[in-house]
């Protein structure tokens, strides 16, 4: 409300106007104690307000800092630079990620609320999407590092909106929330999952259990949405490999059941995509290198937590074991009279060795490694058999 004083027109807030009315009464017929009770102030504060109103008139009830620039306010140059940086270079970052980048790359320590206020005033910044939230119970984290890993694929336009959609296959520890290794592939395939596990086991060891969805490469699925174990179900190549390594498989029935892993995927989609864009990376191989060398270590430092039990649950694999011979799809073939086998719509000619000139009638094991190479082993000696594609 506007109040005229002398030749000046003052704009008072409602609480300031009420304070002025009471103080004016205190200057005539109202006691200081009564005014203090009405304004929820101490008598000493009322005496100070009476003195200010006598000296300044209605301006005496206005706070002294009103209209002043705060001492901690950022300069206009910083404000303009932050808004310009977001619009030109960081337009696909969320605000938290943008604040971190300002501090780390440009040494501009600006708070989240300040940046958010500046961007909203400039009609910029990310647009929030309202999500319908349902009540769910939080599951406690596992106690030990390596006790339980999430392995999941996240399809997204990771390499840019104009690039084909790719899938990030990511292994994440449940106890610490730290991502361990990831790889980009066209789809979430068996070989892609084996490749990620190979790097995890090489670097950390064998985990206690894997928490997975019911994708076809992990377990046998039925049509019509029924995921019921039946007697005629045969184990998948993935289940056979994990059984060999004594790694337990735990299957989730919905994305909500894998909430912690799904949130990690969401964090990667918000943060990794703009970082790959700024780095000029548009191909899967360099994106995988950047992911594991730069991005994952930073995410682990920023969001990882300490496990409740400091002793790790990872186990060392046997020293003599070549993991590639376990993390693969295995099948058997009968050798024909001309020392050939049929595999993947091709005829493979088995080549003789010094100690085994012929394998006619034998059953050999064919392994498809995750690097898409084919390896054939002798049925009795397990030695590798050389071969070539028969034309």
Predicted segments with their positions:
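Short, Lys/Arg-enriched anionic-surface-contact patches
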Residues: 1-21, 68-77
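Short, amphipathic alpha-helical "recognition" segments used to contact nucleic acids or chromatin
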Residues: 13-30, 79-90
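Short alpha-helical "recognition helix" segments of helix-turn-helix
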Residues: 34-39, 98, 102
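Basic, flexible linker segments flanking DNA-binding modules
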Residues: 57-151, 156-157, 226-229, 233, ...
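Mobile-element integrase/transposase regions
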Residues: 108-109, 120-179, 186-208, 240-244, ...
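Acidic/histidine-rich, metal-coordinating catalytic segments
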Residues: 201-230, 252-255
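Charged alpha-helix within mobile-element recombinases
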Residues: 231, 237-325, 365
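C-terminal, beta-rich DNA-binding module of retroviral/retroelements integrases
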Residues: 294-391
